[in-house]
Amino acid sequence: MKQTWRWYGPNDPVTLSDVRQAGATGVVTALHHIPNGEIWSVDEIQKRKAIVEEAGLEWSVVESVPIHEDIKTHTGQYDLWIKNYQQTLRNLAQCGIYTVCYNFMPVLDWTRTDLEYVLPDGSKALRFDQIEFAAFELHILKRPGAEADYTAEEIAQAERRFATMSEEDKARLTRNIIAGLPGAEEGYTLDQFRQHLATYKDIDKAKLREHFAYFLKAIIPVAYEVGVRMAVHPDDPPRPILGLPRIVSTIEDMQWMVETVNSMANGFTMCTGSYGVRADNDLVDMIKQFGPRIYFTHLRSTLREENPKTFHEAAHLHGDVDMYEVVKAIVEEEHRRKAEGSDDLIPMRPDHGHQMLDDLKKKTNPGYSAIGRLKGLAEVRGVELAIQRAFFSK
């Protein structure tokens, strides 16, 4: 695997020098300062690429070129935004950047309720609490019809939880959910959030798939023409939330994508922490079935709690993800490619590390502090080395 590291640009508290010292050789970044839908010019791409290369690193993956909400709702200037997206892909290819991670999650990107969940050892993790989320949706957001998405017990628990919340608790929960997490391109006020949700009131899973198919049929041929590999990121969490459909959550969704646009430019980001939240997702089977189309991996683990829809981010080698078998399947796919004459390594980044040690005293991007990811990268690197030596050394 090619070891990479997510970097949020010049304002990231984790520097490129830190990234290099961590042992990564590739950088995963994006032009976050360019508004959604606007073209990334060759000049802007080259500026960022030069900064990365001056640090002795390579810009390996774009994460992400965000998709304008008009494209997802198939309204407004969606065709203009698609044309702009096509041009951005051409410009990236012109600059020698060929792997693009993206997602098709409506309104929200990845979602958590607690950004400072304290673990028994004193480090902090990200957590999604189903009951707190229900309390937000039922009693703060007050989304019409939300009760239908929860069991009677969850509704009762959410009411009790809400009754114990201080105003600061409510504000923090709201902020965590709607204000935008690292990598998310949108942040909202509560009223704006309600308005954006309303734009999806007539869009179910089938309709959102139609809009995604329209996007794929417009984008993938351009990507293929210029040599760009599109790697869709799964939904996080991988299930419908807030009445919004989710369409990249299961192996069936992956199969639908391949059947909709059967091009090798139409590929996947294997995010084990996102797919792994669902007990019915067999990560190793996903890798084996779609290995030739896996162009990027996010390696992390989560741990489901008593309510299986509640989870927190576990250490990289613990939790519900069998990281050994996942890494072994990825390495096997790389060796399959090598046997066919390709030296195409799969970029991997350690995803969402715990906030720990000295980082507990620093302001960090949630999930993206340095030391927790350094630990995760070192652990995964060790797993890969052991697998390479045990099964593939001559």
From Swiss-Prot:
The keyword Protease does not apply. Its EC number is 4.2.1.8. InterPro entries: Man_deHydtase, Xyl_isomerase-like_sf. GO terms for biological process: D-glucuronate catabolic process. Coiled coil: none annotated. The keyword Manganese applies. GO terms for molecular function: ferrous iron binding; manganese ion binding; mannonate dehydratase activity. It comes from the Bacteria. Pfam families: UxuA (PF03786). Keywords: Iron, Lyase, Manganese. Pathway: Carbohydrate metabolism; pentose and glucuronate interconversion. Its cofactor is Fe(2+); Mn(2+). It catalyses: D-mannonate = 2-dehydro-3-deoxy-D-gluconate + H2O. Belongs to the mannonate dehydratase family. Catalyzes the dehydration of D-mannonate. This is Mannonate dehydratase. The lineage of its organism: Bacteria, Pseudomonadati, Pseudomonadota, Gammaproteobacteria, Enterobacterales.
